[in-house]
């Protein structure tokens, strides 16, 4: 009690530096930041940006934690629609997967969180913004780049990074002040949002170690296999099993379904924004299901060169977003191309769900380029004759034929 009273007195006496907006999750690192920044003379206003990863009960707990560790005020922003409209829609339409496996669950949120924190900071008349990222991960880059672009006039304060604070040090600091340590403070760093859940720490640091069985095996009480139907308009899902549902609501519904089946669990190893390798575990069933279904519908309606160039640009888009470069103008150009490419990506996909896996088993579209009335692969067609096919095959062989002749030095006539 004495330590808490001393801390409260210190915060009152040292508020000379003015208001500061702190991106706040209610976790250990940001809980540490509140009293630490108050000791440094800031009036700390916490900002929780809901990107789809919390229940009403969890948001209430975050509010209580902010007050308990000394926040001057606490602000909640519902950014689920913004995350979907600004980021997730292009990750679906672009089929964006990092390393072909991971759907950028965290990168899809961080820039929006920075945007919302800046808006709140300006409304408060804040002189600075702060976040609780360490100096070893991608989030510090994502936050810092966004904050510098959006609000170059505001100071960026990062106590965890600047002081090199470890988790055990943060716990000891809060305990010394008599302040509550978040109940989930432990060996893992967990991020849950609209586009999936990730966790790092423990087994993720050993590339030979695997996750606990409960994070790999399907739930023992998983439902029986079933099929669902997704309706699509211009590359975005608009209905589930005939019921109109779109945006964050549809993603959340698919997330609940896939979680029950244990769908979407995986491990990703990749390059970080800092150039080192990193490893995480993730569960992102809705993201993987939507991207998988969308890709199959695209195969039905896009030409091969549309698909080829979309794939290249989708990978580049995901790479830039992953590394905090959302504001690069080239991404707006890519978004325009992606949007244009989706003009005919309308139809339905039928998806079979089973414990631990899913499969797209059917697609249909009014714009389907697979027309069995004029051609059936491997069987018959009405678009060309056998002689025309023979001539086409002969011409198609020319580049490779010429390369082979050049390689062995022969000059035999191609007509012989």
Residue ranges and their predicted role:
Residues 8-416:
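Nucleotide-activated chemistry modules centered on ATP-dependent adenylation/adenylyltransferase
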């Amino acid at each position: 009690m004495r330590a808490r009273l001393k801390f409260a007195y210190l915060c009152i006496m040292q508020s000379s530096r003015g208001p500061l907006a702190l991106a706040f999750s209610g976790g250990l690192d940001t809980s540490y930041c509140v009293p630490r920044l108050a000791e440094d003379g800031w009036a700390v206003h916490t900002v929780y940006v809901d990107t789809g990863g919390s229940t009403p009960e969890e948001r209430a707990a975050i509010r209580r934690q902010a007050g308990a560790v000394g926040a001057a005020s606490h602000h909640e922003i519902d950014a689920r629609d913004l995350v979907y409209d600004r980021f997730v829609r292009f990750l679906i339409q672009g089929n964006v997967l990092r390393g072909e496996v991971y759907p950028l669950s965290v990168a899809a949120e961080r820039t929006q969180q920075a945007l919302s924190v800046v808006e709140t900071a300006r409304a408060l008349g804040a002189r600075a913004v702060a976040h609780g990222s360490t100096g070893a991960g991608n989030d510090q880059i994502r936050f810092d780049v966004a904050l510098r672009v959006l609000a170059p006039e505001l100071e960026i304060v990062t106590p965890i990074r600047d002081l090199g604070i470890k988790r055990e040090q943060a716990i000891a600091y809060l305990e010394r002040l008599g302040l509550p340590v978040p109940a989930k403070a432990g060996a893992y760093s967990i991020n849950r949002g609209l586009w999936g859940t990730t966790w790092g720490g423990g087994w993720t640091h050993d590339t030979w170690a695997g996750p606990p069985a409960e994070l790999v095996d399907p739930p023992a009480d998983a439902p029986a296999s079933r099929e669902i139907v997704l309706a699509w308009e211009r590359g975005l899902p608009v209905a589930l099993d005939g019921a109109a549902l779109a945006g964050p609501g549809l993603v959340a519904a698919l997330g609940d379904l896939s979680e029950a089946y244990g769908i979407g669990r995986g491990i990703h190893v990749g390059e970080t924004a800092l150039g080192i390798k990193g490893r995480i575990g993730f569960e992102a069933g809705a993201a993987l299901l939507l991207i998988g279904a969308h890709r199959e519908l695209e195969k039905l309606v896009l030409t091969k060169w549309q698909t080829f160039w979309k794939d290249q640009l989708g990978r580049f888009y995901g790479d830039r977003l992953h590394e905090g470069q959302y504001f690069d103008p080239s991404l707006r150009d890519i978004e325009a191309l992606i949007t244009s490419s989706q003009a005919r990506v309308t139809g339905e996909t039928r998806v079979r769900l089973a414990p631990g896996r899913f499969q797209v088993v059917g697609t249909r579209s009014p714009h389907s380029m697979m027309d069995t009335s004029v051609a059936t692969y491997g069987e018959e067609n009405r678009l060309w004759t056998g002689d025309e096919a023979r001539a086409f095959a002969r011409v198609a062989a020319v580049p490779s034929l010429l390369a082979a002749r050049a390689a062995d030095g022969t000059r035999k006539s191609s007509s012989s």
